[in-house]
């Protein structure tokens, strides 16, 4: 796609009326592409290609005020990798970076086009599934959890990483990213304390359950 910039100037006669117009057309494709690239980089985690924290927070807050279809909820999940520090320590940071990129690729391929995958920092991510039924959301995240059990082997070394998730279902519009994060973080704490590699769900409508 080419971007063209059109500039016009009015020329006036002695009475002050417009007598004619002259203009120029300039190809600004390179400048426009550079601007689009900078805008994308401002929203993107450069290592993994996921949304960065600022962009993810903003996008999720915008979605939270939108009307939901009957029977649907917004689903907010913190995804925290298990044994990631061990992978870094045993195999080196290049393997850790590789794991982060592979995890994001798996999450992006698994999620719907309207879903958000956001890297908060380190090995912590948010997956946001807007306007979805509880049953479909839980099944989707259960399958994703299974996909994120990844075995890394280097010579005689082997490290298995997995993903623990704290999940919140919300059906109201009077809530923010930060409030959902704090509640999901409490669910994540339960998982980390009991059985890593699984998930715990808090339903703001009043139900709680674990896998």
Model regions and ranges:
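PAS-family sensory domains
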Residues: 1-2, 17-27, 159-161
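Sensory-domain boundary capping and coupling elements
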Residues: 6-8, 25
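PAS/PAC or PAS-like capping segment
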Residues: 11, 28-29, 81-82, 132
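Catalytic-core segments of nucleotide cyclases and related cyclic-nucleotide turnover enzymes
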Residues: 14, 93, 138, 142, ...
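PAS-associated C-terminal cap
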Residues: 26-36
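Conserved long alpha-helical elements within nucleotide-processing catalytic cores of c-di-GMP signaling
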Residues: 39, 43, 52-75, 82-112, ...
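Catalytic core regions of nucleotide second-messenger enzymes
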Residues: 119, 139, 148-164, 192, ...
């Amino acid at each position: 796609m080419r971007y063209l910039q059109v500039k016009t100037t009015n020329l006036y006669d002695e009475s002050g009326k417009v007598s004619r117009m002259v203009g120029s057309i300039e190809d600004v494709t390179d400048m426009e592409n550079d601007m689009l690239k900078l805008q994308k980089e401002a929203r993107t985690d450069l290592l993994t290609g996921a949304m960065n924290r600022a962009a993810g927070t903003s996008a999720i807050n915008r979605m939270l005020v939108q009307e939901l279809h009957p029977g649907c909820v917004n689903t907010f999940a913190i995804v925290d990798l298990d044994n990631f520090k061990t992978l870094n320590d045993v195999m080196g940071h290049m393997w850790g970076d590789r794991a982060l990129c592979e995890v994001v690729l798996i999450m992006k391929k698994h999620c719907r086009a309207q879903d958000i995958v956001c890297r908060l920092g380190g090995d912590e991510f948010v997956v946001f599934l807007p306007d979805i039924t509880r049953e479909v959301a839980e099944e989707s995240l259960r399958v994703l959890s299974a996909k994120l059990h990844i075995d890394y082997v280097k010579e005689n070394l082997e490290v298995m990483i997995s993903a623990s998730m704290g999940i919140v279902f919300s059906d109201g519009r009077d809530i923010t990213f930060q409030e959902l994060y704090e509640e999901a973080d409490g669910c994540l704490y339960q998982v980390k304390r009991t059985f890593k590699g699984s998930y715990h769900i808090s339903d703001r409508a009043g139900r709680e359950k674990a896998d």
